[in-house]
Amino acid sequence: MPTHAEKRVVPYRPEQLFDLVADVAKYPQFLPWCVGARIRSQTEKELIADLTIGFGPFRESFTSRVTLERPHRVKVRYEKGPFRYLNNEWDFEPHPTGCCVDFFVDFEFRSRILQRAIGVVFNEAVRRMVNAFLKRARDVYGPPPATVSVVPAPARARP
């Protein structure tokens, strides 16, 4: 049951980061291991998406229901695929130097083989994923001012 929570202050507005995370269709363009994305349905408040993740010899697709609470929260709930469960949440709060991002992911694969494989690289994979979103923000919105940096902050506890 890999779980990861982290909080960072980043030099972008909550709306900007929300828009990047909510744009699931573009994940294959920048997110490591995301090799496909298809939006099944979308409204202003919710979307249903199929994502295909590939790492090493493994390739798995899954369906998620994504709740959009612009500009403060993106919640991902697993619907169908190789997981027993998957919960992912991004919270965006205004901060004097930009935005405080609170990120949480918790999941378990049905397959013990997949669970063991991801367990070995889980922390590195999550770090790369979060950094990919930060790089995407720089690519889309430009570099932050030289006086501002990404600052880790303590993540809040999740149930």
Sequence positions of predicted segments:
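Intrinsic-disorder/low-complexity, polar/charged segments enriched in Ser/Thr/Lys/Arg/Asp/Glu/Gln
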Residues: 3-7, 46-48, 61-63, 73, ...
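Glycine-rich portal/gate segments that line the openings of hydrophobic small-molecule binding cavities
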Residues: 38-80, 132, 136-139, 144, ...
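A conserved amphipathic terminal alpha-helix motif
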Residues: 109, 113-154, 158
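Hydrophobic ligand-binding cavity/cleft-lining segments
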Residues: 1-44, 97, 143, 151-159
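Beta-strand/loop substructures that line and gate deep hydrophobic ligand-binding cavities in soluble
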Residues: 78-128
